[in-house]
From Swiss-Prot:
Residues 267-505 are annotated as: TOG 2. Residues 506-572, 804-849, 1083-1140, 1407-1455, 1940-1959 are annotated as: Disordered. The gene is msps. Residues 513-531 have a biased composition (Low complexity). This is Protein mini spindles. Belongs to the TOG/XMAP215 family. The keyword Acetylation does not apply. Residues 1-229 are annotated as: TOG 1. One of its GO terms (molecular function) is tubulin binding.
């Protein structure tokens, strides 16, 4: 048995490949377990198993194979590497699994296949399954078919492509195996379910019996709705949202109930065919034959080809289309015309969208041919024009359509109208803009009145269809002049019309998301007439809804149309709304506005109107922005109520305009509302007093809608006015708006308006317009001047002067933009945040060529001109070309539509007359310039002619052809040149001259073209010709072909070109390979292949932009390309190339080119060296920079070689050159570093390691020379270096660390720190770990000066990282920060969860044991000297030295600034020096004489009479503590509790401590120190000092107790109540309460969590938990030792929850208000129990967070009552208050909510409450409160207010009342102290201040107080410190105790336990006081409060004297006190607890 299980000791990976099948099963199961636990798909663990998955699925053992499939399924589902395994795994599944005997194995194999589909590997899965369908085993075939069917059923046809499956149906259906046939049938049915009837054509070849069976199955599926049941992983989240949205919408949309099959285009299932190659060679010749039968034969052949091959391959069909068009237009035989029309229809259908290039030439001819009346011809023409329309649009053919509707022939008009009607049934409404709609409607209305009834009927049908499509609202207003009879006919046609496509109509209104307000009477469901703003033409976009099977219909009036001015290119429509009727307006305005305002607006007295508008303006911001139509209601109320905006009083009008502006700024605004008032506001621009206000209103309108829309309205209305003032001011406003908003306008429209202004006769208007033109010139440049070329010279000179003012000025940045409202309306929703809102962004460059009006020269290209150009006489042809030149020159800019001119020019390009060809080339170049980008449409026709001319024998023709090609390329792009293999055809049969020129052109242009701009297939077609020409006999051809190799290699790559060599002859391979190898070094470095999860690299601009110069045209590219390819070889003889190519220059040259490179990068002239993966542009840039810097050419070639061995050679050469050429290294350092960064992205480790070794040498040289890296050098190197710090190889990581440590010495470490911080964002856990280690090193080396607080917070976030190494590194880094910053670290790290914080605390504890904190080097101050630790017998002894206590090792949270720290340490040193000089000789460093003087009157303890102790039965202490059982089984273990209570080994330790540790231990609790830290720090310090305490000997974070506490927050009420009962048993027992001391924070958090849970369930269910929960909370705060150390945040959250419960009537069930009483009692307990400082801070913080929120008023009132209660207690508890913390919290309140914020609030009571706190603190502290303002800026509101308070105190004489309450101050003032009494007390205090007489002074002071009990001594203690107060009080108390003790032997054991005596809590607290060291607390208080560096000398002397007296007193007590045994201490604790319990019971 031992041998059988031996394999379990092996790693999982080895078990998975073990020879023993049981071991493999175990390995597979363990692997599956590991896969389930991995939650990171990119975890390195996945890579260990990636290669094993394929073996798991083909395991020879059946059981192991099953387990392997289970593991593989989990792997594929969760791993990011699963995609890499699909090929091997699917092959194994198909071969071994899918037809396995075991059912589970088959099921698992199918599930794995489906999971691969889910992770988007469906192509590979289908490919393998299709291969399996060809297997010999029928079981495998049937299983593969079944799996494919299942995948198609679950994922749908969009994921599983059906095209390859349809091809397999025929063999599957005819297979001899019945199972295969049945599965094939199921697959066919499933395919039909998804694609419908489109499949039938594909299976028509099947046997009729099979077809009949399938048809029967298909009929069963009719009407079935199909949807995927499973989605790809990338779609799942999106589909879930879509499904939810669809479910919601379907509830309100009944018309979507019908199910339908999403139709698929049958053409998508076909393969395209090239029919051009199949056409007869004599086709065109036959088509020109005179005999019609021959022409018919030619067309029949074409028709057969088109019928047999419905889908056509892309190609050059221009000649075929022209031939068919010629037959249609010219042929007199109607049969041939019909055949040509049918062929044209088939051709258009076969090319689909690709026919668009030919549509414009065909449509006019077809419309014209409709004059033919033969039915067969008309039918054929209809089919043709309908097929062509699928590739074009009505807008593109509008001119031809309008012209045909004006034709004289009625048939043409009728058929054109019918064509429009048919086209509209297949057109989306959005395709018809307002201009086109108006044009069509106007033309059709004209034909509607034709005398021919056919024309009228056709026109009515077209108009009816138009109304059906667009809606009545859009079309009916354009039919106002149509008589009723014709309108009735149109309506009849509208009803009959049927839209044949799914119209993306406007989205239906759904229910409002929230209920309407109480005032608004809006219906529950929005109706069509709603005034809610909505997009005008917003289509429905429900992605989950399928297209209905039957054609959808659109009801009239369903769509609305937006004004074209409201649209911007690529923008979204503006919001509109329904115009409210006057009755509705009256009703709604009365609902929201008071009657006095409405009446005042129409009052005849202007003063009343003024008062009304003033009142309305003040209330304008208080309305509900979500109320429908609020803007329209308010604006129309102002403008619609007489006198409205016709107001004659300028003051009233000013307020009205301000109201409208405020509405536009604060509420959603639509164009409907703007249109109602904008004209009246534009008129007010001319108002002398209110013009500016009107302009502000227009600007507000522009912000709320769009600037373009408002500007259009303003200028349009201004020119309708005759007032020059209005026009002038309108131009002025537009001018200002352009500057404020940026140029967010359509320049073309604006230019037309401004030209009107420039041409105005009024000089003011003209001047304003000219000024606006000058502003426009800043945005549009000097080209704007061409629009004013036709103006008069004087006017042009004025415009030029304005242009000159703005020469060289950049447009200012926009300061205003589209308003972003949160109202939630359509007009201001995030959906409408388009580009118009980006006011702050840079304006897009304006293409002036697009703005210039273009002329359509198509009408001028007449048949006569074309005939003249094709005349046989060359002179006539030349005259025709000359006329054409004149036409183009006159038009200057033309439209791309030039009719049949392009084919005519193509014939002239190959003209036999060279002069004609040259002229034609010049015309083509002229066309490109005049046409712009549109010239690309004619490349297919003209480019073959250009290439022909490029091979002409005459050089001037070749030069003209080259210029023409370049012009077309620059204007329209080069992509079209490479399509259709035009270049390949030219190279194939061209002349040597053509080959030479064409290869030269390609060598020039190809390197500069972006890689993806040209299809690889098109370039690949040139490779065979390239190889042939490399070996051509012509030397020039060979030379230029060799030069073109690099350009082609850039696009195809070396490997692809190398593979193409296989088809070459062996004799040619050597030369071709040599050419490839020569070009290869110049090839740019390839970027890393993109992984599955890597973001795609965006396509970069052309290479010319890399150089960053101004002129980036063709010459620049040509020059650079030549330099890259040949390196000057065109000047050399090829025979001597090998010798002359050797570069003997130094590797690196010393020059000053580096400075220029740095300047270029700073000025953004070149690319910044920042990238994720190196792209080609960066490689080319670096190569060019190296060439410019004269780097050795051979070195450059090796640097950019694809083979890594060349890179190693480069590094070796550079290393050898380093020693003797360091100056050159510095000059080229940036280039070397950049090249090495490229190597960081290579995968070869040898290059990487060698490169790092070289970098170590380089930086050592730089360090020796004390060189400092430039900013550009460091920023281009360090970030890339950090990428390799997380490399898996140790050698690489170590090298990177070594280099980085060197970089710090030559580059500012602060910047290095920033780059390392950026490295934390990496997804690589190892990189994050290393970066954190480097940050630790930097912080340790350079201190906290380099580490901002935000960086510490970011580092702390890494503590919660999943990776353990990252967590440890982050913890180490924060520990280092803690050593330097102390407790301040906790504030810097921000919020951490409990788990992370506990880890950090534990790590800090451990680190402090091994390493002491060292101050950062930035503060060079000598450390304070510490005295040796002194062992004492009790913790009550103080420091025993008259110096400030040394700082606590744990530090404090709030550290003083560095300057204050320096001052404190200097003062500390002085005090230490004084102490050393005057060091007493007595014990503990005290003065023995003083000790003797103090001891002389004391009575020793052993001399006192012993008084018998009370006989108290303490047997109960030995009884076990009973724990109440609960139903949930939650309890604290009894044996553990007993062990904790009686842990004797802690009690028996020697009680020793040191002054420093004691002082540190008992320092006051900082209000900012979290309770979690207190739990760790205080017990740790107590254990270190061996101070016994019940709570301290308990375990910290006992898991069982934590489980009980966390049970309180359980959502299970039974479990929660059980946990509450368990805790109640602990809290109610005083002896057990100490257990919870360290769990207070956790307990409160869980209580709050339960409160949150209860708030979400009904009251009836929650009450049963509220009762015990509130009870235990009351008990908790009623306990003596609990609740005192809660943090500020915990108190704030608790008080918020309690006050919310009191404010919320949820718990007030019936008349019973007991719950509120209980909660009120809890609040009072909290206010009395918790730390007073933390309480005040928490309440102030809660008030700060409450005020801006919409909290219940009762909540705020309760909160302020709590604060007022604290204010009343302030004089009594002032000693407990940390003034610094409270004042800082008040400061934060005033910063967040300053006094200005309260001015607009209805009540400022909270602010006055806060000021009351300050007032009372100032009254208590007096001027001393200024000592607590260290953290408050002097310019703050708090500081100013305190100074004002103190000044008032001085005036009132109240500043002396420090430390007294107001009531006490009155009592003191009422009592007149005599001068003699005052002198007496002063003499007594002088005695106390003297060391020799202080005891005598205390006795006299006690006697004086006994004799004068009415005199308050606090008056005489004003100005002294708190420790001196405490010394006086304790001294008097000690004397009183001695007096009362009388003859008793031990006054500390004479305790009266009567009920009227002190509360037992007092004795427990006093016991705790003695245990933890009362004197230590005094020392801590002294260190916290005395502020010695701020007080005067008198107070300092008093404090120092006090220290000495404390030391003497402590020393005496310790000598006389007996040892207290641990047992006695334990029994005393238990006895006091018992007495306390009895006291409570009574």
């Amino acid at each position: 048995m031992a041998e059988d299980t031996e394999y379990k000791k092996l790693p999982v990976e080895e078990r998975c490949v073990h020879k023993l099948w049981k071991a493999r099963v175990d390995g597979y199961e363990e692997a599956a377990k590991i896969f389930r636990e991995l939650d990171d798909e990119k975890s390195p663990e996945w890579s260990k198993f990636a290669g094993l998955i394929k073996k798991m699925v083909v395991d020879s053992n059946a059981l192991a194979q099953e387990k392997g499939l289970e593991a593989a399924l989990i792997f594929v589902e969760n791993s990011g590497l699963a995609g890499r395994t699909v090929g091997d795994v699917m092959t194994g599944i198909v071969q071994k699994c899918i037809a396995a005997p075991k059912t589970k194995t088959k099921e698992l194999s199918v599930q794995v296949a489906l999971m691969y589909v889910e992770i988007e590997k469906q192509e590979a899965v289908v490919e393998e399954l299709v291969k399996g369908m060809e297997a010999k085993n029928p079981k495998i075939v049937s299983a593969c078919v079944a799996a494919t069917t299942l995948a198609l059923r679950e994922f749908g046809h969009k994921v599983i492509g059906v095209k390859p499956l349809i091809k397999k149906l025929a063999p599957l259906m005819s297979d001899r195996d019945k199972t295969v046939r049945d599965e094939g049938k199921q697959l066919a049915v499933e395919i039909y379910r998804w694609i419908g009837a489109a499949m039938k054509a594909q299976i028509s070849t099947l046997p009729q019996v099979t077809l009949k069976e399938l048809e029967d199955e298909f009929d069963k599926l009719k009407g079935e709705r199909v949807e995927p049941s499973r989605y790809l992983k990338s779609q799942q989240e999106k589909q879930a949202k879509i499904a939810d949205a669809a479910a919601t919408e379907d509830a309100y949309n009944e018309d979507d109930g019908e199910a339908g099959v999403e139709e698929i285009d049958p053409m998508d299932l076909l393969d395209p065919v090239d029919i051009l190659s199949k056409m007869p060679k004599d086709f065109y010749d036959k088509l020109e034959e005179k005999k019609w039968t021959l022409r018919k034969e030619s067309l029949e052949v074409l028709e057969k080809l088109l019928t047999d091959h419905p889908k056509l391959e892309n190609g050059e069909y221009g000649a075929l289309v022209s031939a068919l068009k010629k037959v249609i237009t010219k042929d007199s035989n109607v049969v041939l015309v019909a055949m040509a029309g049918k062929c044209l229809a088939l051709l258009a259908k076969g090319l689909a969208k690709r026919f668009s290039n030919y549509a414009s030439a065909c449509v006019p001819s077809l419309l014209e041919k409709f004059k033919e009346k033969k039915p067969n011809v008309v039918t054929a023409l209809r089919e043709a024009i309908d097929a062509i329309y699928a590739s074009t649009s009505l807008e593109a053919q509008q001119e031809s359509i309008v012209e045909s509707l004006s034709n004289k022939n009625p048939s043409v008009k009728s058929e054109t109208a019918l064509f429009i009607a048919r086209a509209l049934t297949r057109t989306q409404p959005t395709a018809l803009n307002k201009k086109l709609l108006k044009l069509l409607t106007t033309s059709l209305v004209k034909t509607l009145n034709e005398p021919d009834p056919t024309v009228r009927d056709s026109s009515a049908e077209a108009l009816g269809t138009l109304i059906k499509l667009m809606g009545d609202k859009a079309v009916t207003p354009l039919l106002a002049d149509v008589d009723p009879l014709k309108m009735a006919k149109i309506k009849e046609c509208q009803e009959k019309a049927e839209i044949k496509i799914k119209v993306a109509g406007p989205k239906k209104e759904t229910r409002p998301a929230s209920a309407p307000t109480a005032k608004a009477a809006a219906p529950a469901k929005t109706v069509a007439g709603s005034v809610d703003p909505k997009p005008v033409t917003r289509p429905a976009t429900t992605g989950a809804r399928k297209v209905l099977k039957k054609p959808a219909t659109v009801s009239g009036g369903g769509a609305t149309s937006a004004p074209t001015a409201a649209l911007k290119a690529g923008g979204k429509p503006l919001a509109t709304e329904r115009e409210i009727t006057p009755e509705e307006l009256q009703e709604k305005s009365e609902e929201i506005l008071p009657a006095e305002i409405l009446n005042g607006l129409v009052d005849s007295n202007w003063k009343n109107r003024l008062a009304a508008v003033e009142q309305l303006l003040g209330e304008i911001s208080g309305f509900d922005a979500k109320q429908a139509g609020i803007s329209q209601i308010l604006i129309r109320t102002i403008s619609g109520r007489k006198p409205g905006l016709k107001e004659m009083n300028f003051q009233v009008l000013k307020f009205k305009l301000d109201i409208i502006r405020s509405v536009a700024e604060n509420y959603p605004l639509t164009t409907t509302t703007v249109d109602l008032v904008i004209n009246e506001i534009i008129e007010k621009l001319a108002d002398a007093k209110n013009g500016a206000a009107a302009a502000d209103v227009l600007s507000a309108f522009a912000e709320a809608t769009k600037l373009e829309y408002v500007v259009g309205k303003v200028l349009s209305f201004a020119f309708e006015q005759k007032s020059p003032k209005v026009q002038s001011e309108a131009f002025n406003w537009v001018n200002r708006s352009i500057i404020e908003f940026g140029f967010q306008l359509q320049p073309k429209t604006l230019i037309e308006d401004v030209r009107k202004g420039v041409q105005s006769t009024n000089p003011t208007v003209r001047a304003s317009a000219i000024q606006m033109v000058g502003t426009m010139s800043m945005y549009m440049g000097k080209a704007l001047m061409m629009f004013f070329d036709s103006e008069k010279p004087a006017l042009k000179s004025q415009i030029q002067v304005e242009f000159d003012k703005n020469v060289g000025e950049k447009p200012p940045k926009p300061v205003r933009g589209v308003q972003r409202s949160s109202g939630g309306t359509a007009g201001n929703s995030p959906d409408n945040e388009d580009d118009d809102g980006g006011a702050a962004g840079e304006e897009e460059p304006i293409n002036m060529a697009d703005l210039l009006p273009r002329v359509d020269i198509a009408p001028q290209i007449t048949e006569a001109l074309l005939k003249e150009m094709s005349d046989k006489d060359w002179k006539t042809r030349n005259e025709g070309l000359t006329k054409l030149q004149a036409i183009i020159s006159e038009a200057r800019l033309i439209k791309p539509s030039i009719g049949d001119l392009a084919p005519a020019l193509a014939h002239r390009l190959v003209d036999s007359n060279a002069k004609i060809a040259q002229t034609t080339l010049a015309i083509c170049e002229q066309l490109a310039t005049a046409m712009g980008a549109g010239c690309r449409n004619h490349v297919r026709n003209l480019f073959p002619g250009f290439l022909h001319a490029l091979g002409d024998n005459k050089s001037f023709v070749r030069a003209a052809a080259l210029n023409c090609i370049n012009s077309f390329g620059e204007k329209g792009g080069y992509k079209e040149f490479f399509e259709s293999e035009m270049i390949a055809d030219a190279l194939k049969g061209g002349s040597p001259a053509l080959k030479t020129e064409l290869w030269a052109w390609l060598a020039d242009k190809l390197p500069g073209l972006p890689p993806k701009s040209v299809s690889k297939e098109d370039i690949h077609s040139m490779v065979p010709h390239l190889y042939a020409h490399i070996c051509d006999r012509n030397a020039d051809v060979r030379k230029n072909a060799n030069e073109a190799v690099l350009g082609i290699m850039i696009h195809l790559g070396f490997d692809a070109m190398n593979r193409a060599l296989d088809k070459q002859k062996p004799a040619s391979k050597k030369d071709i390979l040599a050419a490839l190898e020569k070009a290869r070094p110049n090839l740019p470095v390839k970027p890393l292949p993109k992984g599955k999860h890597q973001a795609p690299i965006p396509e970069e601009p052309k290479l010319k932009t890399v150089r960053g110069g101004g002129a980036g045209g063709a010459p620049g590219i040509q020059k650079s390309a030549t330099a890259r390819v040949a390196g000057g070889q065109d000047k050399q003889v090829p025979a001597r190339k090998k010798d002359e190519d050797i570069d003997t220059s130094p590797l690196l040259c010393a020059n000053s080119a580096k400075n220029q490179r740095l300047l270029d990068e700073q000025k953004m002239k070149v690319l910044k060296w920042t990238f994720v993966t190196p792209r080609e542009e960066f490689t080319e840039l670096l190569r060019d920079q190296m060439m410019t810097a004269n780097v050795n050419k051979a070195l450059i070639a090796n640097m950019f070689h694809d083979d890594f061995r060349y890179h190693l050679k480069v590094i070796e050469q550079l290393s050898e050159d380093l020693a003797g050429n360091s100056k050159a290294l510095v000059c080229n350092l940036d280039l070397i570093l950049k090249w090495l960064t490229l190597r960081f992205y290579d995968t070869n480790p040898s290059v990487l390691i060698k490169g790092l070794e070289y970098l170590v040498q380089v930086f050592q040289v730089l360090i020796d020379e004390e060189y400092i890296l430039a900013e550009n050098e460091g920023s281009s190197f360090v970030p890339h270096l950090l990428l390799k710090i997380g490399d898996p190889k140790d050698a690489v990581r170590n090298g990177v660390r070594r280099v980085l440590r060197q970089v710090i010495l030559v580059f500012p470490f602060v910047k290095v720190f920033g780059y390392v911080m950026e490295g934390l964002k990496s997804k690589n856990a190892r990189q994050r770990t290393e970066c954190l280690d480097e940050l630790t090193f930097l912080i340790e080396s350079y201190g906290m000066n380099i580490c901002p607080q935000s960086a510490v917070r970011e580092i702390a976030r890494q503590i919660s990282d999943r990776d353990n190494s990252v967590r440890n590194a982050a913890l180490n880094c924060i520990v280092q920060v803690f050593f330097l910053s102390g407790e301040k670290t906790y504030k810097m790290i921000g919020h951490l969860n409990e788990k992370d914080l506990s880890m950090l605390d534990e790590r800090i504890k451990r680190a402090k044991k091994t390493k002491k904190p060292t101050p950062p080097p930035s503060v060079d101050v000598p450390a304070p000297q510490r005295h040796d630790s002194i062992e004492i017998e009790d913790a009550e002894v103080g420091n025993g030295c008259d110096e400030l206590p040394p700082p606590d090792e744990d530090g404090t949270f709030d550290q003083a600034p560095s300057s204050q720290l320096l001052l404190l340490q200097q003062q500390l040193q002085q005090l230490q020096q004084q102490a050393q000089q005057q060091k007493p000789s007595g014990p503990f460093g005290l003065d023995s004489q003083v000790i003797s003087e103090i001891e002389k009157d004391w009575v020793r303890v052993d001399q006192m009479e012993q008084k018998p102790l009370l006989n108290v039965d303490i047997s109960s202490l030995d009884e076990p503590i009973k724990v109440r059982p609960t139903r949930a089984g939650i309890h604290y273990p009894q044996e553990k509790f007993d062990r904790l209570i009686s842990r004797q080994h802690y009690m028996q330790q020697t009680l020793t401590t040191s002054p420093s540790s004691t002082a540190g231990m008992t320092s006051g609790v900082s209000p900012y120190r979290s309770p979690m830290r207190l739990q760790h720090q205080q017990p740790q310090q107590q254990l270190e000092n061996n101070i016994p305490n019940l709570a301290d000997v308990l375990p910290k974070h006992d898991p069982q107790l934590v489980k009980v506490i966390k049970g309180v927050s359980s959502t299970d009420t039974l479990k929660a109540r059980a946990a509450i009962n368990e805790l109640a048993a602990i809290i109610e027992a005083p002896e057990k309460q100490a257990v919870l001391r360290d769990y207070e924070e956790i307990f409160i958090q869980n209580v709050l969590a339960q409160f949150k849970n209860l708030s979400q369930i009904p009251s009836a269910q929650s009450v049963v938990v509220y009762q015990p929960l509130l009870s235990i909370l009351y008990t908790f705060f009623h306990a003596n030792i609990l609740g005192k150390t809660l943090s500020v945040a915990c108190i704030k959250n608790l008080m918020s929850a309690l006050l919310n419960l009191m404010a919320d009537p949820k718990l007030a069930v019936g008349d019973d208000s007991q719950y509120n009483k209980v909660i009120n009692g809890i609040c009072l307990k909290v206010l009395d129990k918790v730390d007073f400082t933390n309480l005040n801070c928490a309440l102030i913080r809660l008030l700060r967070e409450t005020c801006p929120e919409a909290k219940l008023p009762k909540f705020t009132d309760l909160l302020m009552k709590c604060i007022w209660r604290n204010v009343k207690m302030l004089p009594e508890r002032s000693n407990e208050l940390n003034y610094d913390a409270v004042i800082l919290e008040v400061h934060e309140f005033m910063l967040a909510l300053p006094s200005t914020w309260w001015q607009n609030r209805p009540s400022d009571t909270p602010m006055r409450t806060i000021k009351t706190i300050l007032h009372n603190m100032a009254k208590v502290k007096g001027n001393a409160i200024l000592q607590h303002l260290n953290q408050i800026p002097t310019h703050s509101e708090l500081h100013t207010y305190l100074i004002r308070i103190l000044k008032n105190f001085q005036k009132d004489g109240s500043a002396s009342g420090i430390g007294a309450s107001p009531q006490r101050a009155k009592e003191i003032a009422s009592k007149r102290i005599s001068h003699q009494t005052h002198d007496t007390v002063s003499q007594i205090f002088k005695l106390i201040s003297d060391r020799d007489t202080k005891q005598q002074g205390l006795q006299k002071l006690y006697d004086f107080k006994q004799q004068n009990p009415d005199i308050d001594l606090s008056t005489f203690l004003q100005g002294s410190s708190a420790p001196f107060h405490k010394y006086i009080e304790e001294g008097l108390a000690e004397i009183e105790r001695n007096q009362n003790a009388g003859s008793t032997q031990d006054n500390r054991t004479d305790v009266n336990y009567q009920n009227n005596g002190p509360d037992p809590d007092f004795w427990m607290d006093r016991l705790q006081y003695h245990m933890t060291g009362g004197a230590a607390k005094l020392a801590s208080a002294r260190s916290a409060d005395d502020g010695s560096h701020m007080l005067d000398n008198k107070v300092v002397d008093e404090n120092l004297c006090l220290n000495g007296m404390n030391a003497q007193k402590a020393s005496l007590i310790k000598r006389e006190k007996r040892d207290m045994s641990p047992n006695r201490l334990q029994h005393l604790q238990a006895k006091l607890a018992q007495i306390k319990k009895e006291n409570h019971a009574q």
